[in-house]
């Protein structure tokens, strides 16, 4: 399965949702603020956030274990599976998180006026930037390098080893903001809103 086509499809859906929210803000807000939606949105958001975070951490650990094995077959299988999970599992979860999170945020007040909420949203976006610009490209480069190895190759090339090590740090950079989002979401501290940063 060509996971990059699936990822592009989900990115297009996300762009469409963002476009709809920007150009048809009143209609978008009316859909998400409906009182009957709140409890469902909260449950869906908590479940999706938990699954998304767990998938990210499990993927990091699984990749680290495959790298420690030194086996080309194990590493290739791991990266193929992680890429598949990112395309079929993480991408839809991101869309669900975005919609449920926006629905909840509209019920809390103006997104950029609530401190913990606005900072959480920025951290979620930061994690997404690491995922799109760092995680996905290195994942595909690793798959490409591993599939180019000859069946008898016992030693992994230096470029591949460097990428495998780099991915740990890229993944960590993407997961740490999510951990901070969880903390903000649970404790809801009184912190300055993002809108106040620019006044």
What are these regions (language model features)?
Residues 1-199:
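Polytopic transmembrane helical bundles with strong interfacial aromatic enrichment
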């Amino acid at each position: 399965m060509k996971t990059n086509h699936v990822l592009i499809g989900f990115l297009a859906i996300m762009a469409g949702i963002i476009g709809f929210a920007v150009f048809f803000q009143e209609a978008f807000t009316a859909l998400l603020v409906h009182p009957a939606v709140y409890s469902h949105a909260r449950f869906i958001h908590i479940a999706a956030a938990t699954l998304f975070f767990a998938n990210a951490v499990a993927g990091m650990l699984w990749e680290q274990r495959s790298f420690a094995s030194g086996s080309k077959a194990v590493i290739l299988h791991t990266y193929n599976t992680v890429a598949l999970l990112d395309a079929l599992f993480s991408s839809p979860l991101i869309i669900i998180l975005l919609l449920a999170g926006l629905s909840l945020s509209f019920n809390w007040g103006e997104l950029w006026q609530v401190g913990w909420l606005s900072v959480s949203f920025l951290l979620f976006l930061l994690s997404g930037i690491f995922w799109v610009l760092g995680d996905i490209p290195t994942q595909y480069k690793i798959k490409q390098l591993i599939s180019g190895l000859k069946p008898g190759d016992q030693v992994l090339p230096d470029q591949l080893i460097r990428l495998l090590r780099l991915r740990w740090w890229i993944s960590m950079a993407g997961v740490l903001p999510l951990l901070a989002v969880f903390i903000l979401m649970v404790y809801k501290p009184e912190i300055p809103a993002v809108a106040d940063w620019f006044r």
